[in-house]
Amino acid sequence: GLAKIPNIPSKIRKEVTQLYNFVRIADDYVDSVPQDTEGFMKFKEEYYRVLSGKSSDNEVITDFVKLSQKRKFDNKWVDAFLFSMEMDTRKSTYKNLDELNTYLYGSAEVIGLMMNKVMNVNQNADDSARYLGKAMQFINFIRDIDEDLDLKRTYFPVEDLDSFGLSGLTRGEARRKPKQFKAFVRSQIQLYFKWQKRAELGFKFIPKNMRIAVKTASDMYLWTAKEI
């Protein structure tokens, strides 16, 4: 799932939509049931074709590449994003936090970095953007545990599950070991709070009109974390 930011100032709304459309379509391919791996791979190939200067009738990709060039996105960010989406097509568990962090960098942190470029925010806020993207994505994982089980995916590190005596995140395991399950979820929420605090350190670098939008989104996810 992708983090959404409400109340975007109108002057950059079009560009945010172009960014969001590109990300959402890639995400939809890998999250559909059954998963459309072939559709995703074609989408990825088309992106690299357009990036190399070829024309395409895929407006979403064409608009995104133009935006990327206009706002000077680092192409490595898009590589990382597509790599993480591809991980979703072939990976259903993560051994440890390092492995998960690779996924989170491409699926969430780089989106924050692209948003900073679109909002023309000082690079001092890059660290904040990465951690905010990561924190929001992580709360999505916690909120969507049930949904991800249907997709046969567990994003939480196997090492962490083991340390709470859980053999996996299954409905059966949650029913059999409710205390351990609850303690595990609490521990993951603490990790979210840590990343969220790190993100908030850079809010001061975001222009005031943008800060309201980012803070609203951040607060929505914070509220979700407290409700879980």
Can you describe what each PLM-predicted range is?
Residues G1-M136, I142, D146-I228:
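Catalytic cores of Mg2+-dependent Asp-rich isoprenoid enzymes
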